[in-house]
Amino acid sequence: MQHFVAVAASLVVPTITGKEATQLILRWFHIIAGITWVGLLYFFNLINVPFMKQVDAGSKPKIFQYLTLPALNWFRWSALATVFFGMWYWGQFLVAPDAQRQGVGQGSTFGLFLLLWIGVWAVLFVIIKKVTPSGYVLGAITAILVYAAGWIFVNYTPVGGDDNHVLAIGVGGGMGIVMLFNVWGIIWPNNKKIIRGTLAGTPPANAAIMARQAFLASRTNFFLSVPLLFYMAASSHFSSTVIFGK
């Protein structure tokens, strides 16, 4: 792939290397997908949720079909693309070189990263789906879990000794993993069932509960996006920023 993107990039920047071109393309795609994902996340939370409360039942099918469903399709696929390109860039150009310089394997860093952040999501999934708590309780639990996972990653990953690029994205990207799984594990499945049932004239009997669960997952993503964006910016602009005391 590096040779291909190098040729393409040479049309614009003749002196760019294959490695530099790959970095550029991955970050570019990651940013474009991320803007789409977070933009739609803010649309759903700040505009769509209050709007849908004012819509009468007869208007919902058309809104679901021509607005909500297409928006959710862009939302879920842009979420996947954001994480895919971001993890590719992080692993190939940050984790791998740092691991090589320190003489350690990068597998342990990825293993710890996935174990921690998928573990955080699994706990939140059970709480949202089985308990469906108040937003304040869920927010407190989320804050504790995220802080704990971030602290463990920063203090126990074998890489990240050169600067905080690996660590900052390891924390911010970890929140992105939680958000991605919320999208594909709760928000999309619940909304899909509600929308398809409504369009068929037979909405699910537990539609209100499913909507509440999707709302809690979406609102969790909304608040997680704030520190996520901070850590992503810090990784690029403040590579020496102290994170969790390191």
Q: Whereabouts are the PLM-identified features?
A:
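Polytopic transmembrane helical bundles with strong interfacial aromatic enrichment
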Residues: 2-246
